[in-house]
């Protein structure tokens, strides 16, 4: 997948690997909040829009929150084509349930980034939380988008269900870190490693963390406390894709293979 460099789409793979061959995810660029205290992004119905892909686990978690928080009539959504090719995510509509770009009629997701910021340097990822009023990206970090959805629109939806309750936040943050580093991102660390040592280290951490999850859930339904929280929702999209996608494409086997030539 390419990326935007000073507003220009650059094709070809851009390495995210460290000197030791391990994979490091690039931080998201747009990190704004929606809040009554925000100078720009206030909570409003039908002002905000999601760009997502059904193929993307990071986007999947935002769709779960959109549903749970009763935001489906307040935040609109477009579904991109699940194949990511030379021009990145596209708005082709030749796949079931893809919508095209209903706002601007663009062909590619990177063009949405260019609308928001002409000279942006960024990966053109989904999910994107978009502001239709200012024609800008509010946020493209899924972990922050779900936090926004959890609380910013409560007074509009009258849905006060809290998936990041204050009394459980320390525990949620602790397990979120393990889930992100070793499972959510761990599957990519496995598949995108460039040395055998980095690959085996990623696989070891992945499966030890999955064993930890198994132990936690052996006698209870949820990861933290006795209620559904953000931690569960962050884990689910990865687990759903594990056997059918990651095992095949990213070599997530409990017995590491000789995959680095």
Feature-to-residue mapping (PLM):
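GST-like domain detector, emphasizing the conserved glutathione-binding G-site
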Residues: 1-219, 223
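Active-site-adjacent beta-strand anchor residues
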Residues: 52, 229, 252
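Proline-centered helix-kink/hinge sites
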Residues: 125-127, 237, 254-256
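GST superfamily/GST-like fold recognition
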Residues: 223-249
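Single conserved hydrophobic/aromatic residue that forms the stacking wall/gate
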Residues: 251-261
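Acidic, serine/threonine/proline-rich low-complexity intrinsically disordered regions
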Residues: 200, 247-253
């Amino acid at each position: 997948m390419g990326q935007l460099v000073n507003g220009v789409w650059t094709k070809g793979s851009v390495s995210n690997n460290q000197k030791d061959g391990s994979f490091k995810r690039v931080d998201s660029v747009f990190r704004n909040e929606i809040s009554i205290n925000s100078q720009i992004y206030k909570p409003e119905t039908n002002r905000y829009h999601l760009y997502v892909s059904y193929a993307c686990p990071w986007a999947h978690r935002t769709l779960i929150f959109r549903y749970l928080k009763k935001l489906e009539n307040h935040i609109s959504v477009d579904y991109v084509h699940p194949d990511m090719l030379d021009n990145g995510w596209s708005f082709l509509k030749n796949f079931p349930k893809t919508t095209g770009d209903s706002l601007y009629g663009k062909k590619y997701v990177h063009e949405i980034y260019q609308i928001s910021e002409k000279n942006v340097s960024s990966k053109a990822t989904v999910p994107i939380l978009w502001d239709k009023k200012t024609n800008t990206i509010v946020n493209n970090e899924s972990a922050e988008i779900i936090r926004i959805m959890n609380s910013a629109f409560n007074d509009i939806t009258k849905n006060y269900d809290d998936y990041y309750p204050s009394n459980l936040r320390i525990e949620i943050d602790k397990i979120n870190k393990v889930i992100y580093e070793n499972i959510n991102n761990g599957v990519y660390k496995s598949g995108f490693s460039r040395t055998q040592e980095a690959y085996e280290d990623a696989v070891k951490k992945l499966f030890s963390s999955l064993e930890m999850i198994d132990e936690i859930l052996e006698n209870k339904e949820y990861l933290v406390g006795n209620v559904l929280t953000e931690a569960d929702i962050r884990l689910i999209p990865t687990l759903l894709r594990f056997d059918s996608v990651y095992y095949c494409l990213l070599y997530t086997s409990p017995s590491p293979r000789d995959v680095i030539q």
